[in-house]
A protein has these predicted regions:
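Short, cationic-aromatic polyanion-contact patches
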Residues: 3-9, 61-80
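Pre-recognition alpha-helix immediately N-terminal to the DNA-recognition helix
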Residues: 11-16
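Short acidic, hydrophobic short linear motifs in intrinsically disordered regions
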Residues: 23-31
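Short helix-coil junctions and helix-kink-helix linkers
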Residues: 30-38
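Short, hydrophobic-biased segments on the C-terminal half of alpha helices
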Residues: 44-48
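A short, conserved structural fragment
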Residues: 51-60
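Short beta-strand "wing" residues that participate in macromolecule-binding interfaces
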Residues: 58, 67, 106
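Amphipathic alpha-helical dimerization/coiled-coil segments
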Residues: 80-120
Length: 120
């Protein structure tokens, strides 16, 4: 699996692009200026960064952005990284921690059981 270096600020940019694909840079800026304290220049810099990293394809006119990598690719990578760093690669330890520490409803527990049963 290819490793993607994605900073938290870049992930915010990617989430907007994934949610509104395709989307222009000005629309991204409009959305994020409402959600963050970032300036338009900061947002454009972050967009340029994800384009240069190869995560986003930019087309003119209007600097329209489309994702090259998927949300699922990033989720898989970040999940593996978390499991490796905090749980010595053990998914069992991660699931045990979630089940022990979180206040899961019966519906959530049922959903987890269904997911596990589907993997058998």
């Amino acid at each position: 699996m290819k490793h993607y270096e994605l900073q938290p600020s870049e992930l915010k940019i990617m989430n907007v692009i994934w949610d509104h694909n395709p989307i222009s840079a000005s629309e991204i800026a409009s959305i994020l200026m409402k959600e963050t304290a970032w300036s338009k220049n900061t947002i454009y810099t972050l967009i340029t960064r994800v384009v240069k990293k190869g995560f986003v394809k930019r087309t003119d006119p209007n600097f329209v952005c489309e994702p090259i990598i998927t949300r699922k690719q990033i989720q898989q990578q970040e999940t593996k990284s978390l499991v490796d760093r905090l749980y010595a690669g053990s998914l069992n330890m991660l699931f045990a921690r979630i089940i022990e520490d979180e206040n899961l409803s019966d519906a959530e527990l049922d959903e987890l059981r269904k997911l596990l049963d589907q993997k058998r």
